[in-house]
Amino acid sequence: MFANVGWGEMLVLVIAGLVILGPERLPGAIRWTAGAVRQARDYVTGATSQLREELGTDFDDLREPLSELQRLRGMTPRAALTKHLLDGDDSIFTGKFDQNGKSEKPEQKPEKPQSAPGPAAAVPDQPAGGRSGSTPYDTDAT
C-alpha cells in the first residue's frame, strides 16, 4: 500500500502530524496506528489459517486459479493476445511470417539508384530538417 512513499513523503507526514496533533499527542497516535495495523495483520493471518484448516486441500485448489489471475495481471496486452488467442505465435506482431527462414519475396532493389561520384553526389539524401522521409514504425505503440 505504501510502496511508493519515500522518505520525503514520510517527513511531510510527520511534520503534518506534529502540526495537526501537536507534539504531546503525536507519539500516542503513532502507537495507536501501529497497534491497529498489527491487530489487522493478525486478523488476516488468523482468517487465512482458519480457511486453510477448514478447507484442507480445497484451499490449494482455490489458490491455483488466483495465481493464474496474478500471472495474467502482469502480462502486457500483446503478450496476453499472443499466448491465449494466437497460441504463442507472435508473427502477426513481428511481421516474420516465414518459419523456415527463406523469403518468398524477391530481393527488393533500392528506391534511388546510386549516382556516379561527382558534383551531383554532394547533394544530401535527407531534407533540410535532418529527418529522413520515412517515419519509423513501432508495433508496440498502437
From Swiss-Prot:
Keyword Membrane listed? The answer is yes
> Which residue stretches does the UniProt record annotate as biased composition, category Basic and acidic residues?
99-112
Cellular compartments annotated? Cell membrane
InterPro entries assigned: TatB
Residue span of region Disordered = 89-142
Q: Name one GO biological process term.
A: protein transport by the Tat complex
Superkingdom:
Bacteria
**Protein's name according to its UniProt entry:** Sec-independent protein translocase protein TatB
Q: Tell me the organism.
A: Mycolicibacterium vanbaalenii (strain DSM 7251 / JCM 13017 / BCRC 16820 / KCTC 9966 / NRRL B-24157 / PYR-1) (Mycobacterium vanbaalenii)
This protein's encoding gene = tatB
